[in-house]
């Protein structure tokens, strides 16, 4: 299944583009679930200037989606119309410390940012050690773990709007709430400044070890999974509601509710995106019927179903 190839026209309109532009590029290898169709266009910018140039020249009617690390994402089987942007570690992966401030590019792994802070004897960012994503995704969804979240440490973030204009957002402008940012969905975040707190190496390492031990004991980290599937309802745990509804181990096609942690869906090997999304919706329906609680997706679902591209 493929889309009309618009890359020749885009390249002709952007003679100074330095990044990589590919048509009908498979996205499944770029997501942790390893499912989904192609992007009509996949663009990997060389750096911030290249990203701004691309957006400023891209026709306004062409939709744009930034993929992030692909750890909390389902790309539907029909693929993604328009442009998918993937920020590379080479151009957007910096992580360095100045005083008590950690500078992190959007493509920097959350775990690496925690390690960089720890090396500078800065605490407060240990929770990132257990999050399987990048800083760009953390900004977009206010990623958190172990009682801490991005809103607790963010100073400000840099982003580009759909016209290619560079903008700076302080913490308040991000409009953070639980696993959500109210910032314009069209923004593409490129970097952030995070506030650390001086702490002893032993204290920081103990917290990071605790985070890692919890992940290994409680989460199916060696499976093809997208992380936590549903947001925790206020005062409740999504996994408990899912378990109470009898969904532990539930299967649809090649998708399964994890036996280890009910709020994780896994690709057992041959799942389609439709299998995973259908399983998630089945879980939501059973939980609603059993407890009256309507679970909200934490995993982002993008693209079109098979046959719709």
From Swiss-Prot:
Its EC number is 1.3.1.98. Its cofactor is FAD. Its main location: cytoplasm. It comes from the Bacteria. GO terms for cellular component: cytosol. The keyword Cell division applies. It holds the Pfam family MurB_C. The active site is at residues 179, 228, 298. Signal peptide: none annotated. Residues 34-199 form the FAD-binding PCMH-type domain. Keywords: Cell cycle, Cell division, Cell shape, Cell wall biogenesis/degradation, Cytoplasm, FAD, Flavoprotein, NADP, Oxidoreductase, Peptidoglycan synthesis. It is an enzyme of class 1 (oxidoreductase). Cell wall formation. NCBIfam families: murB, PRK13905.1. Belongs to the MurB family. This is UDP-N-acetylenolpyruvoylglucosamine reductase. It comes from Rhodopseudomonas palustris (strain TIE-1). The gene is murB.
């Amino acid at each position: 299944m493929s889309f009309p190839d618009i890359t020749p026209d885009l390249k002709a309109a952007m003679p100074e583009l330095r990044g990589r532009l590919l048509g009908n590029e498979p996205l499944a290898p770029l997501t942790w679930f390893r499912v989904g169709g192609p992007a009509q266009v996949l663009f990997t910018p060389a750096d911030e200037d290249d990203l701004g140039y691309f957006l400023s020249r891209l026709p306004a009617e062409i939709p744009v989606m930034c993929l992030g690390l692909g750890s909390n994402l389902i790309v539907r089987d029909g693929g993604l119309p328009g442009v998918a942007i993937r920020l590379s570690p080479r151009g957007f992966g910096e992580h360095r410390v100045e005083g008590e401030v950690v500078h992190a590019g959007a493509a920097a792994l959350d775990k690496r940012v925690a390690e960089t802070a720890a090396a500078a004897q800065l605490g407060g960012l240990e929770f990132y050690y257990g999050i399987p994503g990048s800083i760009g995704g953390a900004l977009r969804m206010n990623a958190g773990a172990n009682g801490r979240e991005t809103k607790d440490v963010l100073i400000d973030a840099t982003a580009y709007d759909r016209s290619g204009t560079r903008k700076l957002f302080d913490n308040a402008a991000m409009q953070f709430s639980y696993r959500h940012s109210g910032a314009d969905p069209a923004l593409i975040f490129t970097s952030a400044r995070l506030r650390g707190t001086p702490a002893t190496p032993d204290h920081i390492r103990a917290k990071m070890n605790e985070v890692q031990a919890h992940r290994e004991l409680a989460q199916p980290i060696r499976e093809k999974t997208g992380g936590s599937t549903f947001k925790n309802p206020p005062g409740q745990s999504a996994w408990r509601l899912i378990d109470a509804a009898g969904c532990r181990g539930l299967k649809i096609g090649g998708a399964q509710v994890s036996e280890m942690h009910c709020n994780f869906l896994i690709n057992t090997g041959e799942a389609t995106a439709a299998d995973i999304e259908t399983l998630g919706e089945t879980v939501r329906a059973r939980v609603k019927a059993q407890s009256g609680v309507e679970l909200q997706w934490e995993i982002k679902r993008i693209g079109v179903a098979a046959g719709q591209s």
